[in-house]
């Protein structure tokens, strides 16, 4: 949004990681002017009022699903021809529903390897689509809500506005709500009637200064650690006013027996002194990034933990349901794997080397088991560099010593 705004936008509280650096690097490759101060966690972006400074080029998005989906949509709305490349991991993740709707809007997309996947060549629609032609598309978001977020984010580039009908059973979600709220903060309003999304013509992003929220997804690992060990965690500036759906994980911890409180510094989680957790059945559709975190806690519960409505996580950095089942089995924990759910039975984990599948959330979540069980080793722990490169240093700093 900062790149598409008119003028200079300053972003404060930026999380620097492999994903965000690949996104910023892609913007630089497209000719956008940025100033980066990692120590101050500030990025300044010179927006180009809904245009791309160059009309050809190649970008590399790494393993970042957000960069892959958002930048593909942005380039499809632009003028020129571009190549989008990605890591081997990202090349396996679904893109076809987004490609299909972008082609319906007039973009030309050529898959350079496997049909429906990156890498691709994109020829944008600007200058080739009649300015008065109504833009109306249908979209299936069952595989990823990022497809819809991508279209919404670039909708101000479409002068005649955009109408999106959602054809999948799922119509909305926590990340879509975040997208809409942030767009509104930047001056672009999205209407939603329960079935369809409407963006009026003439919408523009306004430049300014934007304070980014703390990463609640990252905070949840440390909140889970408190619940698991009977300890206490406060994450600065994480409050109930945050937009992120992963706040629901804190309510889940409360239902499992942890104490959740407000403090002047941020939300606090205190685990039961005996470290005991209750079994639970939960629909995690809207905060599925924490599925692995809950799976790591589940063996220590007093009953079964059943996680439902998570079939879409099979299509993320790894087949996450299968990865959870496999690694819990390596720990000696029994579970029942289903197409879109998993039931985990309580037990006593044994020492094991946990495989991470180059999935940052597998590495971070399963490290929590090691807080209660000796002999837990995480293979390829630095895959967490994708979103939280200092995770293990932070975790180590919080662990008490004899």
Language model features by range: what are they?
Residues 1-402:
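Structural preference for solvent-exposed beta-strand-turn elements
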């Amino acid at each position: 949004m900062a790149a598409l705004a008119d003028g200079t936008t300053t972003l404060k509280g930026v999380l620097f990681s492999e994903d965000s650096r690949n996104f910023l690097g892609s913007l630089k490759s497209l000719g956008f002017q940025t100033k980066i101060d990692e120590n101050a966690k500030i990025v300044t972006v010179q927006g180009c009022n809904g245009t791309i400074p160059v009309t050809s080029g190649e970008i590399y998005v790494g393993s970042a699903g957000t960069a892959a989906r958002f930048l593909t949509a942005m380039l499809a709305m632009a003028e020129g021809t571009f190549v989008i490349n990605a890591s081997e991991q990202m090349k396996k993740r679904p893109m076809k529903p987004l490609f299909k709707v972008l082609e319906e809007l007039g973009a030309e997309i050529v898959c350079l390897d496997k049909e429906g996947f990156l890498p691709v060549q994109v020829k944008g629609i600007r200058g080739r689509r009649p300015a008065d032609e109504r833009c109306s598309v249908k979209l299936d978001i069952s595989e990823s809500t990022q497809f819809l977020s991508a279209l919404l984010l670039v909708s101000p580039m479409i002068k005649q506005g955009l109408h999106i009908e959602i054809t999948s059973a799922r119509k909305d979600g926590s990340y879509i709500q975040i997208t809409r709220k942030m767009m509104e903060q930047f001056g672009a309003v999205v209407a939603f009637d329960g079935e369809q999304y409407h963006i009026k013509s003439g919408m523009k992003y306004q430049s300014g200064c934007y304070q980014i929220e703390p990463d609640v997804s990252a905070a949840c690992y440390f909140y889970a650690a408190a619940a698991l060990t009977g300890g206490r965690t406060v994450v600065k500036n994480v409050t109930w006013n945050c937009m992120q759906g992963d706040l629901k994980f804190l309510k889940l911890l409360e239902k499992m027996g942890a104490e959740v409180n407000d403090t002047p510094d941020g939300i606090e989680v205190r685990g039961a002194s005996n470290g005991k957790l209750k079994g639970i059945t939960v629909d995690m559709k809207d905060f599925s990034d924490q599925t692995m975190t809950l799976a790591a806690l589940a063996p220590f519960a007093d009953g079964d933990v059943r996680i439902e409505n998570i079939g879409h996580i099979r299509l993320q950095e790894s087949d996450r349901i299968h990865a959870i089942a496999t690694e819990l089995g390596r720990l000696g924990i029994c579970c029942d794997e289903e197409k879109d759910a998993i039931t985990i039975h309580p037990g006593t984990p044994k020492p094991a080397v946990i495989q991470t599948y180059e999935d940052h959330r597998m590495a971070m979540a399963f490290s929590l088991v090691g807080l209660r069980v000796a002999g837990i080793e995480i293979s390829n722990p630095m895959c967490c560099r994708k979103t939280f490169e200092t995770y293990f240093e932070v975790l180590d700093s919080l662990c008490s010593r004899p």
